[in-house]
Amino acid sequence: MNTLFMHCRPGFEGEVCAEISEHAARLGVAGYAKGKPQSACAEFVCAEAEGAERLMAQLRFAQLIFPRQWARGSYIELPETDRISVLLEHLAALPVFGSLWLEVLDSNDGKELSTFCRKFEVPLRKALEKAGRLVDNASLPRLLLTFISGRRVFVGVAEANNSALWPMGIPRLKFPREAPSRSTLKLEEAWHQFIPREQWEQRLGDDMTGVDLGASPGGWTYQLVRRGMLVTAIDNGPMAESLMDTGLVQHLMADGFTWQPKQPVDWMVCDIVEKPARTTSLIETWLGEGLCREAVVNLKLPMKQRYAEVRRLLDRMEATFKARKLKVSIACKQLYHDREEVTCHLRRLDLKPRK
């Protein structure tokens, strides 16, 4: 159980290694990180047997930026036949589990294995239940089996309340046909990632106002409109007619980096292609001056030192708000629908409740 296994977007293995290594050093967990480029996974091999468990106990998964999913455990080799017996034998030393997820890597090889996993899950689930290794109890640890091939699997453990919301950290969101661009899924995923479902009515209500900076053609505006918000769309480019026809959108031809609302709004969202430092300044202005209560903003990443740059900008925001004596929660994640970017969620915690 001394290895921490993490899924990620292909090409971001180095960022996962840098991020987890920094946390491990801070927490005094000895070990080393490794990740093969484009493999869609990375691991932190701990020097001590309980190292991975310590890391997971002292970190909140939601605070990690680049890992999509994590689990502590080890690899085992499986025979061509009777894989279940070998797995049961290995699991005898582990706790009873409250749920089971079979996972594959987000790679071509992984996608080919997904059919095998679907077929294998039913008999495996039955065998685990019969052996008393799997019960229906959300408070118990989750068993995460990541198949590298039909013969090699990472047998992992994670707490259901401190790991990804979905298998492999990949949400099953359906692209709405009426949305003007696929980028709409980024904002929908952000709602799921950053706002507990039971708070949606309160924090994403139809009595709210929103601003979309760099809105054209309206992929993110669509999500705000879908929640029933009155939206001001800022962009010199055109907006989809279907959105304008709702009567909920006011389109202003202006620069998203200079325009400001006359009255504070509930939400500001922004997916402009710009250097991340400039976008960070925009965030600091909007949250710092109380122009919005909450914001979802994408930071486009540089080619090199991507984790270091994100960390620097997040630390800068935190220091800026602290210096102004403002209470702002800051979260950041590379979402499944993100590309060379990360998504930030910010919320003012010190404003009076809405009337």
From Swiss-Prot:
GO terms for cellular component: cytoplasm. Keywords: Cytoplasm, Methyltransferase, rRNA processing, S-adenosyl-L-methionine, Transferase. Its EC number is 2.1.1.186. InterPro entries: RlmM_FDX, RlmM_THUMP-like, RNA_MeTrfase_FtsJ_dom, rRNA_MeTrfase_M, SAM-dependent_MTases_sf. The keyword Methyltransferase applies. Its main location: cytoplasm. It comes from the Bacteria. One of its GO terms (biological process) is methylation. The active site is at 300 (proton acceptor). It is an enzyme of class 2 (transferase). Monomer. Catalyzes the 2'-O-methylation at nucleotide C2498 in 23S rRNA. NCBIfam families: PRK11760.1. This is Ribosomal RNA large subunit methyltransferase M. It comes from Pseudomonas putida (strain W619).
